[in-house]
């Protein structure tokens, strides 16, 4: 799995009566993650950034919010804590065997991007939460 990559696609999160659909641009390096989340029409809604000093959520027209973890801010934004390290693993074909209370991950479609095999469509479920990721573009980055 490349240590650094850039990907873009669509993210959907459904939990109970709440459903969020967004465009996602994701840049991952060894030390950080950046998610730029946009509306389906392309308007930037939020930026989630993480690094050695914690994570920051910046929403359009609002003051930046900080937390110790990326997961805490995805929970604030999307209603569910998402671990970018786990999702990077899923993206690169590492769908873990599900244990009680963990995500049940299905790689619904795969693709090849250069020399990298990766998931094109991922569905992850846990309890009443469904997360879907569709990857439209991907490239490994040099560090």
Where are these predicted regions, by residue range?
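A short, Trp-centered hydrophobic/proline-enriched beta-strand micro-motif
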Residues: 1-17
């Amino acid at each position: 799995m490349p240590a650094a990559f850039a990907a873009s696609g669509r993210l959907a999160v459904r939990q109970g009566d709440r459903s969020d659909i967004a465009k996602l641009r994701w840049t991952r390096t060894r030390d950080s993650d950046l998610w730029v989340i946009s509306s389906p029409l392309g308007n930037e809604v939020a930026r989630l950034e993480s690094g050695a000093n914690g994570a920051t959520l910046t929403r359009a027209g609002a003051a930046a919010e900080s937390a110790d973890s990326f997961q805490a801010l995805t929970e604030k934004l999307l209603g569910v804590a998402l671990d970018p390290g786990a999702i990077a693993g899923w993206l690169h074909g590492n769908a873990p065997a599900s244990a009680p209370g963990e995500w049940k991950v299905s790689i619904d479609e795969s693709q090849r991007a250069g020399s990298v095999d990766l998931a094109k469509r991922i569905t992850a479920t846990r309890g009443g939460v469904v997360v879907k990721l569709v990857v439209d573009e991907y490239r490994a980055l040099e560090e």
